[in-house]
């Protein structure tokens, strides 16, 4: 993970948690990533964009003063999803094992890579 912080620019690294399918662990991963980075001494902003509001993280300040901004998105795709992807440095796509999540995952990948062709993303199987 440390390579994410060696950008050579004075801008925050934006980590986007995204998947069209709800209930796959986006919010839990977002909370844990933010807390883990804070415990390591990084200044972290947290964007709770999910209207369900399930995140436990209390810092909602997103700006370039942070080393990292962690953005938790809702479990649906919208025009805003593309905007989030345009401004992201990496996207994390949590998925659950099984076939039900494949189509939403593929649609998510299509939306974020069309919005930001250079976006790196990781698919994390969560159960």
Label the model's feature ranges.
Residues 1-12, 118-127:
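C-terminal lobe/tail of nucleotide-utilizing enzymes
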Residues 5-42:
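Walker A (P-loop) phosphate-binding motif
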Residues 40-55:
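Short beta-strand-centered segment that lines the nucleotide-binding/catalytic pocket of NTP-utilizing
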Residues 45, 70, 122-123:
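A structural signal for isolated positions on well-ordered beta-strands in alpha/beta enzyme cores
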Residues 52-64:
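P-loop NTPase switch/communication element
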Residues 74-127:
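Conserved catalytic-core segment of NTP-binding enzymes
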């Amino acid at each position: 993970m440390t390579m994410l912080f060696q950008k050579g620019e004075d801008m925050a690294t934006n980590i986007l948690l995204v998947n069209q399918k709800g209930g796959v662990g986006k919010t839990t991963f977002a909370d844990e990533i933010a807390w883990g980075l804070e415990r390591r001494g990084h200044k972290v902003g947290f964007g709770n964009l999910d209207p369900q509001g399930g995140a436990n993280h209390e810092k909602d300040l997103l700006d370039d003063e942070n080393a990292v901004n962690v953005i938790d998105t809702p479990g649906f795709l919208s025009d805003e999803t593309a905007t989030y992807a345009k401004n992201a440095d990496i996207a994390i796509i949590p998925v659950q094992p099984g076939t039900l999540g494949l189509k939403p995952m593929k649609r998510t990948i299509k939306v974020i890579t069309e919005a930001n062709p250079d976006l790196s993303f990781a698919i994390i199987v969560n159960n």
